[in-house]
Amino acid sequence: RQFKQTIKEADGILLIMPEYNWSVPGVLKNAIDWLSRGEKVMIGKPVMTAGVSPGMMGTIRAQLHIRQILSSPGVQGRLLPPAGNEIIINLAEQKFKDGRLVDEATLQFVDGVIQRFIQFVQKG
């Protein structure tokens, strides 16, 4: 109940995920399924997705799948438009040091997307 209440009260949701077998982690899918039952707290909620992976493709397949899930009946999150707003960090081992993102170009890109998401949330 607390999780559902937290999502209900949030101005927006940022989902950061890995990619497992070309899809979203099962625990994330389960959480979204749970949020879509009873009081549907995701409907109309601004959502942005991001992912990090050591592979060349980043989390592109999981990102595509999560967008489908978030658009489904009972969920219907208000997704930040994808054009230029998808944070898909590939080759993570080259871009992180001691758990911190250190690649300057990626940092600048992420900062820009976060700023656009804040504006997206504020516009309602």
What function would you assign to each model-found segment?
Residues R1-Q5, T106-F109:
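A short, well-ordered alpha-helical element
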Residues G77-G124:
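Glycine-rich phosphate/pyrophosphate-binding loop and the adjoining helix
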Residues Q2-Q76:
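Helix-loop-strand module that forms the ligand-binding subsite of alpha/beta enzymes
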